[in-house]
A protein has these predicted regions:
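N-terminal intrinsically disordered, cationic/polar leader segments
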Residues: 2-82, 86-123, 127, 133-135, ...
């Protein structure tokens, strides 16, 4: 996964998130730049960062292994989404109406990291359903780089 020695202490990173959502013929793109923490545990890489929006702050944790990913969000938005290229995964979204079932069908999942420095990319493409109804196609990329 990386040439870095496994460490449980975290490193400050700058996170650049890009998301493109396609629903039918319509597409929307969003970008976020945030500062967060990077750490490794076992065979997984973790990114922790906050998203500040009108609704409030959402704390996000992204966990990536060679073949799977998990995105956990808490705070203003509470969501759990799992990704695996070999099978659909169930997750959840908590709303005022209760907890809704999310299903992801991963089309592409990759993680690359420059072994000489703490800088990398996580790319994810997936179809999202909520309560078994299609929501849209998502393409997400996260670039992270150690803060000097």
């Amino acid at each position: 996964m990386s040439g870095l020695t496994a460490k449980t202490d975290s490193t400050p990173v700058k996170v650049h998130l890009k998301t493109k959502i396609t629903i039918g013929e319509e597409s929307d793109s969003f970008e976020l730049v945030s500062f967060g923490r990077y750490y490794e545990k076992g065979d997984a890489v973790f990114l922790k960062y906050d998203e500040v929006q009108e609704e409030g702050t959402t704390h996000t944790i992204v966990k990536v292994t060679d073949s799977q990913a998990l995105i956990l969000r808490s705070g203003a938005i509470k969501m759990r989404m799992a990704f695996n290229e070999s099978e659909e995964q169930n997750g959840s979204y908590e709303s005022q109406l209760g907890t809704l079932l999310l299903t992801t069908k991963t089309k592409q999942l990759s993680h690359t990291q420059d072994e000489s420095k703490l800088e990398g990319d996580f790319n994810l493409s997936y179809e999202l359903k909520m309560q078994d109804s299609p929501v849209g196609d998502y393409v997400m990329s996260i670039h992270y780089k150690e803060e000097a």
